[in-house]
């Protein structure tokens, strides 16, 4: 399962799956034109040569194509998943067989998860990474929290707020006991992080506002070719895939409550309506609520919708949007799942600790909870990402958009010197990512004349929209 060296070479579930993984990677490459075009553009140049990149992002077939793109561009890469259930074991095995250090398997414990995250931050010779590809911000969090502990070791004595925090602090305690300046040394060499998802971006902006951010960050999530494609069209396909693989439920005729109507919520609501469900949306934002209403969705509070829904989908990036009290009031056989990043959108820990409910595992990532009054609910993927825990995540083509942005962000951070702040990729690069994906869809762009370009005040080659344009 492992190979020992100065640092661990890999830890995956089953190396015999590598050939299967390689076959699927070959198929995915044909569906990821942005990444393949980036490889071709920089062939032989190795613009990431010398860069040590730590990746904390779902270890899927699509991510394997990203990893091998970064390696082809010259980087030294170590990888772990950012979710205990999202790894595709055949993908991890294929990457390990290719000689790339990877620490990921489906069904990690929280202790194992944070151990894996620690491994990607430990390169040969005791060095840390120069760059991070993050999804949810956990690798970035580990460095920042470790840095704080080195300043104030009493933080290690505080009582953990939950079981995940306990697992993280155990790893940080071990690091501190081995080297009390480890994270200061790591931070000193960091060139930056590119962050994939809404939750991680929120963390970055919060750290920047508190003047705690230790290195530059690029917000990949808010690139148009990420948020308006991965979050919207990706969720539109992968949500239903996860729910159906887990439960075989017929969605048509059911009432589906979608909590949140951002880009992920929009894609989720469209998916469920397309299957014939009646969709109720909950929202805190009046603009998003108005959008949902104008699309024909009922918009109501969770307290009102809780007794109507057959299926509940959280998409908010916030915590406690489905509480234990909500679950007590739900219809019998209600299905609950999350397609936001963390499991704290649903009060999973209070549910597991509640003496008035009996838990029965049906199959991996499907648990039935029966309450004292006899009604039962089904929780998918333990409240973590249903599309990756119960299925295989977004399709390759839409992930090519996101991962091309990630690659460009890594190139930006490595080849340029950024001051500490949170940045977005320039509009011109956003348009270039879209352009790379048009030919495969048979799209033919109209070309402006010089007079037309001058009339609307844009360059012939773009960008064609101002930074504030919302698409």
Swiss-Prot record:
Catalytic activity: S-adenosyl-L-homocysteine + H2O = L-homocysteine + adenosine
Any one Gene Ontology molecular-function term assigned to this protein's record: adenosylhomocysteinase activity
EC class of the enzyme, as a word: hydrolase
Gene Ontology cellular-component terms listed: cytosol
Residues involved in NAD(+) binding: 197-199, 231, 260-265, 283, 318, 339-341, 387
Family as reported in the entry's similarity comment: Belongs to the adenosylhomocysteinase family.
UniProt-recorded name of the protein: Adenosylhomocysteinase
């Amino acid at each position: 399962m492992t190979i020992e060296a100065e640092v661990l070479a890999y830890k995956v579930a089953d190396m015999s799956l590598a050939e299967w993984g390689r076959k699927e990677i070959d198929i995915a490459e044909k569906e990821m034109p942005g990444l393949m075009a980036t490889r071709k553009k920089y062939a032989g140049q190795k613009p990431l040569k010398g860069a040590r990149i730590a990746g904390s992002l779902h270890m899927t077939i699509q991510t394997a194509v990203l990893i091998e793109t970064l390696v082809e561009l010259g980087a030294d890469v170590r990888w772990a998943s950012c979710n205990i259930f999202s790894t595709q074991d055949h993908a991890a095995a294929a990457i390990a067989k290719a000689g790339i250090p990877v620490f990921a398997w489906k069904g990690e414990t929280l202790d194992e998860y944070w151990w894996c995250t620690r491994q990607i931050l430990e390169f040969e010779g005791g060095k840390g990474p120069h760059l991070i590809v993050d999804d949810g911000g956990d690798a970035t969090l580990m460095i920042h929290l470790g840095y704080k502990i080195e300043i104030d070791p009493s933080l290690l004595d505080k009582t953990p707020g939950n079981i995940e925090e306990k697992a993280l602090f155990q790893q940080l305690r071990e690091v501190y006991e081995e080297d009390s300046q480890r994270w200061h040394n790591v931070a000193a060499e960091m060139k930056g992080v590119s962050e994939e998802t809404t939750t991680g971006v929120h963390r970055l902006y919060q750290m920047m506002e508190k003047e705690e951010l230790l290195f530059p960050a690029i917000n990949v999530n808010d690139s148009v070719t990420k948020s308006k494609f991965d979050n919207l069209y990706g969720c539109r396909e992968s949500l239903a895939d996860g729910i159906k693989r887990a439960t075989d439920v017929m969605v048509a005729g059911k009432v589906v409550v979608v909590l949140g109507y951002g880009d992920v919520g929009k894609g989720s609501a469209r998916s469920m309506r397309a299957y014939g469900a009646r969709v109720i949306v909950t929202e805190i934002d009046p603009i998003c609520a108005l959008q949902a209403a104008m699309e024909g969705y009922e918009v109501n509070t969770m307290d009102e919708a809780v007794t109507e829904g057959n299926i509940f989908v959280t998409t908010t990036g916030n915590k406690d949007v489905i509480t234990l009290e909500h679950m007590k009031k739900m219809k019998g056989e209600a299905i609950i799942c999350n397609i936001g990043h963390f499991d704290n959108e649903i009060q999973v820990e209070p549910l597991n600790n509640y003496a008035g409910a009996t838990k029965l595992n049906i199959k991996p990532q499907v648990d039935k909870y029966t309450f004292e009054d006899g009604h039962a609910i089904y929780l998918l993927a333990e409240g973590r990402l249903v599309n990756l825990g119960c299925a295989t995540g977004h399709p390759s083509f839409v992930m090519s958009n996101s991962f091309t942005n990630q690659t460009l962000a890594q190139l930006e951070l490595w080849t340029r010197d950024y001051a500490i702040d949170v940045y977005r990729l320039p509009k011109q690069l956003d348009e270039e990512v879209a352009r790379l994906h048009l030919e495969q869809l048979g799209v033919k762009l109209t070309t402006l004349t010089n007079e037309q370009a001058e009339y609307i005040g844009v360059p012939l080659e773009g960008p064609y929209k101002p930074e504030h344009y919302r698409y």
